[in-house]
């Protein structure tokens, strides 16, 4: 099963369009988590205390942990997150908070080193930007979590930038990015 994390707020999202091109190459069943419907709230004092209590009791089946369980069980993960303010929408950060759960998506060894517990071996981060992508901090953050915590071996970024620059040939830019999807492969 491929998990599609749709962090695109806009109905007509170019990031989602590019992500769909990635999904079309995979040929697997897809479960979608969308920022516009089923999405975790940012951690609060209360939800963090509940999560800590659940983990202390070993109650990993609680609904609060469903996003982490789903993420850990996925065979492949595709995330669509537009490039906003040098990162991605705040809701995407809330999603990462919900899935970064010790005992479900990673564990610490006796030296405090995290080790991944996720089934997925591939994570594809898809992003688009109206201007140039400077630093790609959103991808860097996702990549650090995937490699450093979740144990996901292959992490790649598919992007299209300059889409809102006056005179930009948006269809051509997106078509070029889509060509890169096939050549990048898994």
PLM feature segments, named:
Residues 72, 90, 118, 150-153:
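Structured loop/turn residues at beta-strand edges in well-structured enzyme cores
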Residues 9-12, 130-133, 163-165:
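Short histidine/acidic/glycine/proline-rich micro-motifs that form metal-
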Residues 1-101, 179-186:
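N-terminal beta1-alpha1-beta2 submodule of the flavodoxin-like/Rossmannoid cofactor-binding fold
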Residues 96-99, 103, 127, 150:
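Short, well-ordered alpha-helical segments in soluble proteins
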Residues 140-186:
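Glycine-rich phosphate/pyrophosphate-binding loop and the adjoining helix
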Residues 7, 35, 127-128, 160:
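Cofactor-binding loop segments of dinucleotide-utilizing enzymes, especially the Rossmann-like FAD-
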Residues 109-150:
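Short, glycine-/small-residue-rich phosphate/pyrophosphate-handling segment
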Residues 101-111:
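Conserved nucleotide-sugar donor-interacting segment of glycosyltransferase catalytic cores
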């Amino acid at each position: 099963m491929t998990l599609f994390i749709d962090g695109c707020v806009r109905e007509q999202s170019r990031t989602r369009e590019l992500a769909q091109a990635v999904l079309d190459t995979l040929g697997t069943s897809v479960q979608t988590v969308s920022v516009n419907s089923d999405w975790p709230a940012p951690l609060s004092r209360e939800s963090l205390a509940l999560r800590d209590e659940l983990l202390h009791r070993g109650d990993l089946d609680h609904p609060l942990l469903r996003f982490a369980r789903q993420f850990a069980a996925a065979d492949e993960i595709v995330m669509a997150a537009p490039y906003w303010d040098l990162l991605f929408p705040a809701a995407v950060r809330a999603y990462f908070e919900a899935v970064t759960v010790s005992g479900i998506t990673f564990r610490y060894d006796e030296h405090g080193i995290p080790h991944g517990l996720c089934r997925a071996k591939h994570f594809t981060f898809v992003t688009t930007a109206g201007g140039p992508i400077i630093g790609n901090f959103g991808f860097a953050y996702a990549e650090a979590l995937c490699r450093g915590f979740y144990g996901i071996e292959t992490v790649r970024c598919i992007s299209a930038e300059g889409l809102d620059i006056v005179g930009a040939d948006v269809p051509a830019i997106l078509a070029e990015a889509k060509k890169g999807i096939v050549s990048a492969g898994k």
